[in-house]
């Protein structure tokens, strides 16, 4: 699109948080026609707003009032359940540890929200994500200036065509500057904590939440020699590298070193734990992925030397990426990686450019 800003209508996904609020303010300052949209993605049915949806809506309304813009609302809870939450449960049932934020971006924020915004007459949508997009030629997903807050890890699965109609107004800002702008603008949320964790779980214990939807299957915990050293409550409640909550201690044959989850044996319903943070079973050098989702739908020539992350905010890790057939890749890291977790995502970078990623299927 080549419209001038004053002729360009942008609908900002406003969560009630400081980031999306400042995103809207920056677009107004740049001369765009701006409206907000508050989306509700989870219908609480237990009488408690774990998602703090009502508080968040009030915060978004306060900001919209200060900015003098219209605030739309939309309920995407049905789409969220069908496209995100059902997959989340299926992955946990299969013993993997999914990342629903990645799927939420792909299916809700950059699909359902974008489609709805277009029906409202938007030329673009905008969000408070810390990311940048190059709109020269084919859209490229670029890291944010604030590398500590960069969220390209969570955006890698979004179809690149969606970025042609997306603006990221915070991509060139550091977080402290965002809070300063919010305070300067008179936003009540300028000191509001960043949201953490999964919205629909909120402050509840993860185990308490998950057992509402999936029946637990308790079983044995074994050490790396096959000795039974405890009992687990259900494999789905544990993630690789986890230390807390194992209930192992005081074994006469063991040292005082802490125990960590090293593996899940799904066939036997056994959790395997090892002692010591540097135990070899906690590390892997190679992973195999599910089919890749390249941002530009074009894979680089493989094998390729790239950097990768297997979790958010992890420092870039050097690796060689090789074609494994059927759209999958094999990743060989320069250094062994700790607690690489099936169900999570590996995301690839070439300098500042986020190339894409895939769900981790297995490690070696």
UniProtKB/Swiss-Prot annotation:
A Pfam family annotated for this UniProt entry: tRNA_Me_trans
The Gene Ontology biological process annotation of the record reads:
tRNA wobble position uridine thiolation
What positions constitute the catalytic site? 104, 199
Give all cystine bridges in this chain: 104-199
Annotated region Interaction with tRNA: the residues are: 149-151, 311-312
Under the heading SUPFAM superfamilies, the entry gives:
Adenine nucleotide alpha hydrolases-like
Catalysed reactions, as listed in the record: S-sulfanyl-L-cysteinyl-[protein] + uridine(34) in tRNA + AH2 + ATP = 2-thiouridine(34) in tRNA + L-cysteinyl-[protein] + A + AMP + diphosphate + H(+)
Q: Where in the cell is it found?
A: Cytoplasm
Could you tell me the EC number(s) of this protein? Answer: 2.8.1.13
Positions of ATP binding: 13-20, 39, 128
Name the HAMAP family for this protein: tRNA_thiouridyl_MnmA
Q: Belongs to which family?
A: Belongs to the MnmA/TRMU family.
Listed name of the protein: tRNA-specific 2-thiouridylase MnmA
Source species of the chain: Alcanivorax borkumensis (strain ATCC 700651 / DSM 11573 / NCIMB 13689 / SK2)
């Amino acid at each position: 699109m080549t419209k001038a800003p004053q002729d360009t209508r942008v609908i900002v996904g406003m969560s009630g948080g400081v980031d999306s609020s400042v995103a809207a303010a920056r677009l107004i300052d740049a001369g765009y026609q701006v409206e907000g949209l508050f989306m509700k993605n989870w219908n609480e049915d237990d009488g408690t707003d774990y998602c703090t949806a009502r508080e968040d809506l009030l915060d978004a309304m306060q900001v919209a009032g200060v900015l003098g813009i219209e605030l739309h609302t939309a309920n995407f809870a049905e789409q969220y359940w069908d496209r995100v939450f059902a997959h989340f449960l299926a992955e946990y049932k299969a013993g993997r540890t999914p990342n629903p934020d990645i799927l939420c971006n792909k299916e809700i924020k950059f699909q359902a929200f974008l489609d709805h915004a277009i029906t409202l007459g938007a030329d673009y949508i905008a969000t408070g994500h810390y990311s940048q997009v190059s709109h020269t030629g084919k859209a490229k997903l670029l890291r944010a200036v604030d590398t500590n807050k960069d969220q390209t890890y969570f955006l890698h699965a979004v179809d690149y065509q969606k970025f042609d109609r997306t603006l990221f107004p915070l991509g060139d800002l550091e977080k402290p500057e965002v809070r300063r702008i919010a305070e300067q603008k008179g936003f009540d949320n300028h000191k509001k904590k960043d949201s953490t964790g999964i919205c629909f779980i909120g402050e509840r214990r993860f185990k308490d939440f998950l057992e509402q939807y999936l029946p637990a299957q308790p079983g044995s915990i074994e050490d790396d020699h096959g000795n039974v050293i405890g009992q687990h409550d259900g494999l789905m409640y544990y993630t690789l590298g986890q230390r807390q909550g194992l209930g192992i201690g005081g074994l006469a044959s063991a040292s005082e070193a802490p125990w960590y989850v090293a593996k899940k044996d799904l066939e036997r319903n056994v959790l395997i734990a090892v002692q010591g943070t540097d135990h070899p079973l906690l590390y892997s050098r190679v992973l195999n992925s599910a089919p890749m989702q390249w941002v530009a739908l074009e894979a680089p020539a493989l094998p390729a030397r790239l950097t990768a992350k297997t979790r958010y905010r992890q420092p870039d890790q050097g690796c060689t990426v090789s074609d494994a057939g059927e759209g999958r890749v094999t990743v060989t890291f320069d250094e062994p990686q700790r607690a690489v977790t099936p169900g999570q995502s590996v995301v690839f970078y070439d300098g500042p450019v986020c190339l894409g990623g895939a769900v981790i299927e297995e490690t070696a």
